[in-house]
Amino acid sequence: MNIAFLSSSNPNDQNNWSGTLYSLYTSLQKKHRVIWVGETVFAEVWEFHKANFKNNETFFPENYALLFGKLFSDLLKKECYDVIICRDYFFAAYLVSDIPLIYIGDTTFHLFNQYMNWQDKSLTKLAEQLESLAIQKVDKIIYCSEWAKQSAMQDYNADAEKIEVVEFGANITENIPIPDNVSPINAPCNLLFIGRNWNMKGGNKVLEIYHNLKGRGFQCTLTIVGSEPPMSLPNDPNIEIYPFIDKTNSNDRLKFHEILTRSHFLILPTRFDCFGIVFCEACAYGIPSLM
């Protein structure tokens, strides 16, 4: 099939959306012709916004949903596609096409805003309207959880018949063997924290847990991946920090593999996660997760 792929994020970049876009995009490419339609459109609209508003107004793609709808509707007419897969509700809301349209997501705006609590009421109202338009317009919706599905039905009156729940995976590209090692009983317990948003993912709580264990005489280490503590930490040889691991880089992927291989527990007292790909990654390595 010829598949049009609409996404504001680059589906070729493994760092976007925890690698789910990349896994979806490349998996489809194995058997179909998949085109990232209008890959420059989002960037061009962003540049237009910056040129006109400088730094006086934050860029929110929701404000350009009508423009996105017009641009993508025109682009889709230039080639014969069998299906459209859309990642962003602000792309789908005003899209005009006879081609079957699939919307894929991990949450609804209603659920998202329960945690993020946007203060701009007019923007919140607009986002709710766009989400509703997208949900009603599309032919099929794929969510990764019953949680998101229930919200779509209850908060946006979505038709249950057109929603499918497909759980996402770990998005690990290499088939790297995991050593079957059993740590000695007196070996340190290696704790792992993975998260880009230190506060939302509970980074301070993880440090508290680590220091509490050390204070009780437990031998342990802590590896922090994806962010840095906002405060300066006393020098501790048992804490390793990797602010960013680039999954498009083979050396970084191997480093990520090495970190997961030697970890005993993932600790992630997160306050907000739509699905939690990191838990899938931990499961792939047989690592118990503590929330």
How does the language model describe each region?
Residues 120-141:
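Membrane-proximal helix-turn-helix segments that form the acceptor-binding/catalytic region
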Residues 179-201, 206-212, 222-223:
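Conserved donor-binding/catalytic core segment of Leloir-type glycosyltransferases
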Residues 271:
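Aromatic "clamp/platform" in nucleotide-sugar-dependent glycosyltransferases that forms part
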Residues 288-291:
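Short hydrophobic beta-strand element within catalytic cores of glycosyltransferases
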Residues 147, 169:
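Carbohydrate-associated surface elements
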Residues 256, 276-279:
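Short glycine/serine-rich donor-binding loops of glycosyltransferases
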Residues 95-115, 121:
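Active-site proximal beta-strand in glycosyltransferases
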Residues 228-265:
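Nucleotide-activated donor-binding/catalytic signature segment of Leloir-type glycosyltransferases, i.e.
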